Design a protein with these regions (language model features):
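Short phosphate-binding/catalytic loops that engage adenosine nucleotides
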Residues: 66, 181, 224, 344, ...
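Short, Φ-rich (hydrophobic/aromatic) sequence segments
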Residues: 56-61, 112-119, 471-484
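Feature activates predominantly on carbohydrate-active enzymes
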Residues: 3-12, 16-36, 44-46, 53-56, ...
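Residue-level preference for non-acidic, small/hydrophobic
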Residues: 104, 574-575
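Short, solvent-exposed secondary-structure boundary motifs
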Residues: 58-60, 74-85
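Short acidic low-complexity segments
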Residues: 63-75
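Substrate-binding groove of N-acetylhexosamine-processing glycoside hydrolases
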Residues: 1-27, 34, 40-42, 46, ...
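Zn2+-dependent metallopeptidase catalytic core
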Residues: 50-66
Length: 575
């Protein structure tokens, strides 16, 4: 077993992410008729939230060989105009001029980055055609994550709010903003940040809140909200102070070997959840909200005592007279009420993490229906999906880049979710299928996933887990797809995605992406192959002349040594 060590941050990619992207024009041409340009920033921006987007635009245009002046040359203008929804924008292009119109700063930001794409695709020259481009997001929340921020899990368990490392350098935030990310998530717990009449203040609370406030303020300059990832209310052991002082918060039935789950039927539990979440969001009102795995990953409330395929009653359910979905509903409403009492615009994303391929119990199939209307109901997009490979049907759980989806269970949940917003958990940079690479170049798969989400009226997306969040092609594709209405063709979208980076070679590049797409969908649709097969740790496998029959180790867990040679483990569920 490896020793518990803090993560090393002297990776070359970390230093690379601190540098602003160097403007590159694939079809560089001599400057057109306008050797000069000027910016008319008429959009009202009292907090200077657009300063970073304007500076990004200036960097690209100056790299194209243009000189900024007060009045002469090409005019780039921003102005306020009523739009249909938040972040929507218009680009009105004509020879010598582009007007970016929106009703809010984030619409202007999105329009500026679209203009940069057009500038790059035009070889570092201003677009001269007459055209009006109108875009609005169908996904209002688009969450990413820093590739090198700590995961805060055993055995390393590093808390990024207690160190002095800047996990969000300006250059990285600019990349996220250009790629359409408007939220990042970091890991914490309720009792680390909040206080209530039931709990004492954590000794490091003020330190955490101070850094959290700094990060939230910095990210806001790029139109990015900070979200708190949690598994709450987290079940507690018998020796936990909260359990010993307030047993009324917890379910009455004791399950041997299991922590004590919270009881949402208790008014004290409702009060506790409201108070502690209100305190957090009153302390840092700029937060976007909470992403909470409320069921499936670790025990939280009493429904956690049941597996996702188990329809038997909860042990003490006869005392509260509530069905399992009503119990969950009460907990979610309390958390959401507390969040909004602290910050009216913040939201709760209730993540029902059900990764297993087995058919779901009826209470799990009803989660979407019972989720409160002001809470986003988020489900895994691919879990439980089916594919025909090697002549037979395969059903796999967890996350998949290579499976377009959605799984039928996700489709059913989305159709059931008529009383509130629906969210999706995707894995679109890379997944456990091939973890060592930054991303897999399959934007066609992303297109098909996002088109399905559009048709199912999905409003929120979590684009990665601890892996698969490195900036690049797939993040760029997802950000642009979030603003699609899919009235055009897939081929047109892929060409538009390629042109700012590949220019005259874009058609060939799109053909290469299509080949990658066909090939990657042949990846064995087997959870054991995804987790343990050689593509992730091949060089560390044992190749002894005589087999040791050591089990294969999970390469995503730092407390296991790589290796093993029982290769039959990876294929038994597939062939």
């Amino acid at each position: 077993m490896k020793e518990n060590i803090l993560p090393e941050l002297n990776f070359p990619f970390v230093e690379e992410m601190k540098k602003f992207s160097r403007p590159f024009f694939p079809d560089k041409k001599a400057s057109a008729s306008y050797g000069k340009w000027h910016l008319k920033a008429a959009f009202p921006d009292e907090k200077n939230l657009l300063e970073t987007a304007y500076e990004s635009c200036r960097r690209y245009i100056s790299s194209g060989g243009y000189e900024e002046c007060d009045f002469d040359g090409y005019l780039l203008e921003t102005k306020q105009e009523k739009t249909e929804k938040f972040e929507a924008y218009f680009l009105t292009l004509s020879p010598g001029k582009c007007v970016i119109s929106a009703n809010d700063t984030e619409g202007i930001r999105r329009g500026i980055y679209e203009f940069i794409d057009l500038f790059c695709a035009n070889g570092g020259s201003f677009p001269e055609k007459e055209e009006v481009i109108t875009r609005k997001p169908f996904l209002s929340i688009r969450l990413g994550r820093c590739p090198f921020s700590p995961i805060k899990r055993w055995p390393v368990n590093t808390d990024e709010l207690l160190d002095d490392i800047d996990y969000y350098p300006d250059a990285y935030l600019e990349t996220l903003a250009r790629d359409g990310i408007n939220g990042i998530w970091l890991v914490t717990q309720l009792q680390e940040l909040g206080v209530s009449s039931f709990t004492q203040e954590d000794p490091h609370r003020k330190q955490r809140l101070a850094k959290l406030s700094r990060v939230a303020e910095k990210c806001s300059r790029y139109g990015i909200k900070v979200w708190l990832f949690m598994i709450e209310p987290f079940a507690l052991p018998d020796d936990a102070p909260l359990y010993q002082k307030h047993p009324e918060l917890f379910m009455r039935a004791k399950i041997p070997g299991m922590k004590n789950c919270f009881c949402p039927a208790s008014e004290s539990t409702i009060q506790y959840l409201r108070e502690i979440t209100k305190d957090i969001f009153s302390s840092v009102p700029a937060l976007g909200g909470i992403v909470d795995i409320v069921y499936g990953e670790r025990p939280t409330t009493c429904p956690s005592t049941k597996f996702s395929h188990d329809d038997s009653p909860i042990l003490c359910q006869d005392q509260c007279k509530l069905n399992t979905n009503e119990i969950m509903q009460k907990a979610l409403q309390a958390i959401s009420d507390g969040i909004k009492a602290g910050s009216k615009d913040a939201k709760l994303i209730a993540w029902y993490y059900m990764p297993h391929a087995a058919p779901l119990a009826s209470f799990c199939r009803n989660f979407a229906k019972y989720t409160p209307e002001d809470v986003i109901a988020q489900f895994n997009f691919e879990s439980g999906g089916e594919k025909i490979q090697l002549g037979k049907k395969h059903c796999a759980g967890d996350y998949w880049v290579s499976y377009e989806g959605p799984a039928e269970r996700y489709r059913e949940a989305a159709l059931q979710r008529t009383n509130g917003p629906m969210g999706a958990k995707l894995q679109l940079g890379c997944g456990h299928e091939l973890t060592p690479v930054p991303y897999i170049p399959v934007p066609e798969i992303a297109y098909n996933k996002y088109k399905a989400m559009y048709e199912l009226n999905v409003k929120s997306v979590l684009q990665s887990w601890y892996i698969g969040n490195f900036p690049g092609l797939m993040e760029q594709a997802c950000g642009r797809l979030a603003f699609e209405d899919f009235s055009g063709s897939k081929e047109d979208f892929l060409l538009r995605l390629a042109r700012p980076f590949w220019g005259k070679y874009s058609e060939e590049v799109v053909k290469a992406w299509e080949i990658f797409n066909k090939a990657y969908q042949l990846f064995p649709f087997s959870l054991l192959f995804q987790y343990y097969a050689p593509q992730n740790a091949f060089m560390m496998w044992k190749y002894h002349f005589l087999p040791d029959l050591d089990p294969l180790a999970p390469p995503w867990k730092p407390n296991f040594e790589f290796g093993g040679d029982t290769i039959g483990e990876i294929g038994r569920a597939h062939v």
